[in-house]
């Protein structure tokens, strides 16, 4: 069955891999968005012929507008964060896939849900920063929330037997361990962005690759899993699975465990979200068990990797705690990639923000953005 897809964040790592899936399935692209990569989105417009395109960066939008001038059948151009929400709200697509990086994707997620669209969610920050708002909107509008993160897709797939899902007692959330697995604090002190960007298994963008190196990504995924699957954080166990073959598992009341396995390729969870509930042939090679010499399992070291410890504190505090942790991390990673702070400073700053307030209680969307702003300012003032 052909589908129409709106893809938010089309020029990033998840976005381009999503287009691999869309191309292979022969789906129609209704809308695309990017932040600033004009050349790449021009190539995508040429191939996929979307009806609408949004550029959230004003300078990039002006360049794209000039490049599209005079073209026959050029897409309508939307601009800025409001343009992104306008695109997410438009009637036409069967699914909106949100692969925007960071809290910038939250508004579009909420708008898509409130407009009645099924949402394939790669933007984990939507749930981390505004989990209560997102899950409340999903329930109110009766749409599907389809996880795209490989771990959450794995859990989602393991829970498709609705009767067994009632007996869920534990989630085993797997982690690769990142490029610095097994290292202690002193060994991490001099690590550079070049070191941190060398992920052993996954092809990802710069921000999420740094998050994998600090284990912040796993902390964010823990928070995301709490909102997606309704288990308290103490029932979600993080297990380091270095080969990234077991993508996560669930345990039931009889202590049986069901896991989802596959090659480490993001196009598997992307495809499952876009074709759900169907399973169809795709672009990813099958897993050859005869090549697997071993599968290893280890404990995540949150004493060394303080971002993970900070996220656990944040979700226990509740309220805006996870939002504060995320905002601090986004700002700290930006500074690290600009060579303005060291690798260990990321965890120090995230934990300091989480420790700075109680953060409990209910919140509005305005509160989320205010908390994010506060966390970023805290980081900049505590360098």
Regions found by a protein language model. Name each.
Residues 1-383:
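Catalytic, metal-anchored helix/loop core of enzyme active sites in primary metabolism
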């Amino acid at each position: 069955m052909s589908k129409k897809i709106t893809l938010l964040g089309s020029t990033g790592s998840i976005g381009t891999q999503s287009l691999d899936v869309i191309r292979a399935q022969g789906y129609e692209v209704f809308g695309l968005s990017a932040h600033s990569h004009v050349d790449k989105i021009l190539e995508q417009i040429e191939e996929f012929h979307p009806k609408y395109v949004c550029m959230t960066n004003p300078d990039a939008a002006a360049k794209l507008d000039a490049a599209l001038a005079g073209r026959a059948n050029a897409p309508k151009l939307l601009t800025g964060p409001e343009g992104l929400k306008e695109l997410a709200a438009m009637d036409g697509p069967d699914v909106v896939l949100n692969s925007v990086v960071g809290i910038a994707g939250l508004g579009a997620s909420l708008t898509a849900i409130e407009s009645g669209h099924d949402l394939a969610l790669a933007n984990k920050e939507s749930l981390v920063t505004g989990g209560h708002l997102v899950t409340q909107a999903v329930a109110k509008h009766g749409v599907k929330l389809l996880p795209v993160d490989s771990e959450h897709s794995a859990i989602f797939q393991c829970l498709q037997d609705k009767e067994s899902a009632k007996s869920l007692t534990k989630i085993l959330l797997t982690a690769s361990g990142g490029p610095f697995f097994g290292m202690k604090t002193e060994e991490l002190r001099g690590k550079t962005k070049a070191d941190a960007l060398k992920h052993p298994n996954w092809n990802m963008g710069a921000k999420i690759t740094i998050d994998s190196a600090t284990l912040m990504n796993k902390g964010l995924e823990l928070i995301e899993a709490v909102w997606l699957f309704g288990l308290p954080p103490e029932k979600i166990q993080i297990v380091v699975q270095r080969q990234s073959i077991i993508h996560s598992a669930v345990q039931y009341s009889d202590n049986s465990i069901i896991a989802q396995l596959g090659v480490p390729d993001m196009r598997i969870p992307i495809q499952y979200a876009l074709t759900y509930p169907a399973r169809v042939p795709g672009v990813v090679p099958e897993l050859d068990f005869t090549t697997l010499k071993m599968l290893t399992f280890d404990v995540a070291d949150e004493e060394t990797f303080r971002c993970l410890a900070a996220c656990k504190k944040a979700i226990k505090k509740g309220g805006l705690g996870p939002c504060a942790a995320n905002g601090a991390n986004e700002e700290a990673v930006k500074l690290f990639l600009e060579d303005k702070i060291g690798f260990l400073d990321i965890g120090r700053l995230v934990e300091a923000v989480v420790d700075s307030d109680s953060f409990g209680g209910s919140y509005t969307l305005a509160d989320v953005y205010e908390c994010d702003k506060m966390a970023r300012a805290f980081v900049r003032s505590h360098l």
